[in-house]
Amino acid sequence: MSYRGLTILGCSSQQPTRHRNHGAYLLRWNGEGLLFDPGEGTQRQFIYANIAPTVVSRIFISHFHGDHCLGLGSMLMRLNLDKVSHPIHCYYPASGKKYFDRLRYSTIYHETIKVVEHPISSEGIVEDFGNFRIEARQLDHLVDTLGWRITEPDTTKFISEKIKAAGLKGPIMQELINKGIIKVNNNIIRLEDVSYTRKGDSIAVVADSLPCQAIVDLAKNARILLCESTYLEEHAHLAKNHYHMTAKQAAEQAKRAEAQQLILTHFSARYNTTEQFVQEAGEIFPNVFAAEEFCSYEFPKNAN
């Protein structure tokens, strides 16, 4: 089974600090590497995290404020240098096309990799690969900003003891999957009698935004919600003025969405530590963590 986990490569907001780099988040999922919002210095963060940049297959830019995209050009150049053979898919708001091009071609280099652009102009399902799908929703920020949801489908798992007891094997198994009900030796067998549904995982990634319904929709029953929480509640006026959230507001979104786990990120440089973020959010949503650089949050496939 391939590794599944979310690695924090950076968790600061507009200004990096001595201990927090610009944001960048790597989701390794079903054999793919999904990189979200690579800020300045991201390729160096891969070195510190002891992860090869070549795992990246898809790059997501929520919006084109610098702390969410300044690492894009250097990451593409690094992937060229490493001569990756797989295409690099890039997803971003269509209104930011000119900024994407400026970042991609900001320096002189010989591009050899295949970059597949996905400028997104409407909400909904962006792509569906069968084993997972990508959804985008418009957030409430100062510029066009997208939030993301990565979802894998539910799967049917057979219960071996019940399959054996029912005398099922070979082609008749596929017939049961296709029809949902079959007759075997004068017995009616329903799919739900000999199987259970394994709920597919989903992860929501929410960058800069005020609280909004789109966040709740993206994070609905998600296993992980990675959510910006730039400020503490004592600076709620700054959050409102700059179209950001507090830790409390992020927790409220997670609670409304009934997410399983909340990871706070995008911390303002005014805060030296993040303990208060966890404390503030935890009063509303207990299963909460503050992102830490190079920490990985693993999530093996659900057993049920």
From Swiss-Prot:
Root EC class: hydrolase
Positions with a binding annotation for Zn(2+) 2: 67-68, 208, 266
Q: How is the cofactor bound?
A: Binds 2 Zn(2+) ions.
CDD domains in alphabetical order = RNaseZ_ZiPD-like_MBL-fold
Family from the record: Belongs to the RNase Z family.
- Binding residue positions for Zn(2+) 1: 63, 65, 141, 208
Supply the InterPro entries for this chain. Metallo-B-lactamas, RibonucZ/Hydroxyglut_hydro, RNase_Z/BN
Q: What is its EC number?
A: 3.1.26.11
Q: Which reaction does it catalyse?
A: Endonucleolytic cleavage of RNA, removing extra 3' nucleotides from tRNA precursor, generating 3' termini of tRNAs. A 3'-hydroxy group is left at the tRNA terminus and a 5'-phosphoryl group is left at the trailer molecule
The UniProt function text for this chain reads: Zinc phosphodiesterase, which displays some tRNA 3'-processing endonuclease activity. Probably involved in tRNA maturation, by removing a 3'-trailer from precursor tRNA.
Stated name of the protein: Ribonuclease Z
The record's listing under Pfam families reads:
Lactamase_B
List the source organism.
Answer: Chlamydia muridarum (strain MoPn / Nigg)
**Keyword vocabulary terms for this entry:** Endonuclease, Hydrolase, Metal-binding, Nuclease, tRNA processing, Zinc
The keyword Hydrolase belongs to this UniProt entry's keyword annotation: yes
The UniProt subunit note reads as follows: Homodimer.
Q: Which cofactor does it need?
A: Zn(2+)
Locate the active site: 67 (proton acceptor)
Q: Which GO terms describe its molecular function?
A: 3'-tRNA processing endoribonuclease activity; zinc ion binding
